[in-house]
A protein has these predicted regions:
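Hydrophobic positions on the alpha1 helix immediately C-terminal to the Walker A/P-loop
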Residues: 185
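Flexible phosphate-sensing "switch/lid" loops adjacent to ATP/NTP-binding sites
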Residues: 1-173, 189-350, 354-357, 364-366, ...
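Transmembrane alpha-helical segments and their cytosolic interface motifs
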Residues: 182, 359-361
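Short clusters of small/polar residues that mark proteolytic maturation junctions
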Residues: 373-374
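The conserved Walker
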Residues: 177-178
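A short, polar/charged loop-to-alpha-helix boundary motif
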Residues: 377-393
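Short HxH-centered metal-ligating active-site micro-motif
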Residues: 391-423
Length: 496
């Protein structure tokens, strides 16, 4: 698969730029860290070559200078807010993040509870952290926030917050999710630092939108697609244009809040170090795109994937999706047509040839497309998976990798003992059967060794797949899209 992004250059440039920003201030920088730190798969999809843990690796280059402060809102603790990608509550995710940071050698200094309320759930969480040896600090609700700047930047505002004691020049402020109070925590710390005579600084690190590529570049449009539920809109930064006469891309929320943030800087430090919200950022990703065409194509595919996901989510939930209108607009802006990708065309062609039965297609790294159809032994996704492995291994498509004799006992187990009504093998089941066959069958072993080559391949199904198949395909690193159609449309209940 072609690379469009130089990851090594990114790690070097990004860490160096943050060091330079630390040096601009009194050797103390509060860095608001947005987006996913450990597993930024969106970035790896739209910038081929970007590693999902690149931001973590960049921080590790600064680990002797850095400490982590994790922020969580008391309101999210009380409401037991759940992080959608992990399915765990925000308070548990704080513990997960602490383990993850410490596990790679990063120093976690403390946890800050924002919007503090002395509710039992909040106090219990605070006690739990203290019992684990994690220091906690409390920041409180400020009446009139964020518009009453004079009150906020005073002893009645930030002054009431506890000062978070930190030890290192770079303080990374991160959180389980948006709306936790990262920026407010940074600005509160600046207020207290200046009171103590330390001329600390603030910066913001977010990968998207990329400020120094065109507004309607597919990479930036793909970011809008990823945040369609938040209704974020990329815009030309008017403050940057006025200050420098140059265009830069930012998004609506940062642009809207900048006058308020700028006024806070002036009250805290006497003068704002920044002329625009873009100035506050430290993102160097745009400088590390080495093949623009590759990144454009990858981003166009991501927009299509986001659209199909929204269609399927709407089908599964039964609720109208407001995201779809935004995504349709983005499809038009990117000049995309649903149904034009080879995996869509060929999966539908197979389905039509088999009387409308479910079908699937996978596009391999060299551009070749292999398909799979529904049969008595295998579902379409499982069939496509085996055919892809055969193609990659140079095995004849007519050769059986797993014999019927090996599959039939598994079907008997499923239907006679495990209560399944579907005898066909799911993707995880056929892979287990293939690995068992590989012990005595060199052809099967050869096919099994190709699994890693499926990472990054696009796959399309003419029906919504089960959660078992979806999870397996995701774990293989493939990019799956499904038509918003159930295999049995007339049924009222559909197991996921």
């Amino acid at each position: 698969m072609k690379k469009g992004f130089d990851n090594d250059k990114y790690l070097l440039m990004q860490s160096q730029h943050i060091r330079e920003r630390i040096a601009q201030f009194d050797n103390k920088l509060y860095l608001e860290f947005g987006g996913k730190l450990f597993d930024d798969y969106h970035a790896s999809r739209v910038l081929p070559g970007f590693q999902p843990d690149s931001k973590l690796q960049m921080l590790l280059q600064l680990k002797d200078q850095a400490e982590i402060v994790i922020v969580i809102s008391a309101e999210d603790i009380i409401s037991s807010k759940v992080r959608g990608d992990y399915g765990i509550t925000y308070d548990l995710d704080v513990l997960r993040l602490i383990d993850a940071f410490q596990g790679v050698g990063l120093f976690v200094g403390s946890v800050c509870i924002t919007m503090y309320t002395a509710a039992p759930e909040v106090e219990q969480f605070e006690q739990r952290l203290n019992g684990l040896g994690i220091r906690t600090f409390c920041h409180y609700k400020i009446p009139g926030y964020p518009n009453d700047v004079a009150r906020i930047v005073s002893d009645e505002g930030y002054g009431k917050n506890e000062y978070i004691e930190t030890q290192r020049p770079l303080v990374v402020i991160t959180a389980p999710g948006p709306g936790s109070g990262k920026m407010a925590t940074c600005l509160s710390q600046l207020y207290h630092e200046y009171k103590r005579g330390v001329k600390a600084g603030y910066a913001k690190f977010e990968t998207f939108p990329i400020w120094n590529i065109p507004l309607k570049h597919p990479v930036n449009l793909a970011y809008e697609a990823a945040t369609a539920d938040l209704n974020d809109v990329n815009m030309i930064d008017p403050f940057h244009l006025e200050a420098y006469g140059k265009t830069a891309v930012n998004y609506n929320r940062d642009i809207e809040i900048f006058p308020v943030v700028n006024a806070m800087f002036e009250l805290i430090a006497g003068k704002s170090p920044y002329h625009s919200p873009t100035d506050m950022g430290v993102n160097m990703a745009g400088n590390c795109i080495v093949d623009d065409a590759v990144c454009r194509e990858a981003s166009r595919n991501e927009i299509v994937r986001r659209y199909f996901k929204a269609l399927c989510d709407q089908k599964v939930s039964g609720n109208a999706s407001s995201e779809l209108f935004k995504l349709e607009l983005l499809l038009n802006q990117a000049g995309l047509t649903v149904g034009s990708r080879p995996v869509e065309q060929q999966s539908h062609a197979v389905s039509e040839k088999t009387g409308g039965a479910p079908a699937a297609a996978i596009q391999l790294p060299d551009g070749t497309v292999v398909t799979g159809k529904t049969g008595p032994l295998l579902g379409a996704a499982s069939s496509a998976l085996l055919n892809a492995l055969k193609k990659l291994a140079g095995i004849d498509q007519e050769e059986d990798l797993v014999s019927c004799r090996a599959i039939e006992p598994i079907q008997t187990l499923k239907t006679n003992y495990l209560g399944s009504k579907n005898p066909r093998l799911h993707t995880d089941e056929i892979l287990i059967a293939l690995s068992s066959s590989a012990a005595e069958n060199e052809t099967a072993a050869k096919a099994l060794r190709q699994l890693s080559k499926l990472k990054g391949c696009d796959m399309h199904s003419t029906v919504i797949l089960s959660s078992v198949d979806t999870d397996t395909i995701k774990r293989l690193g493939m990019y799956l899209t499904c038509e918003p159609v159930y295999e049995e449309e007339d049924r009222k209940y559909h197991k996921r």
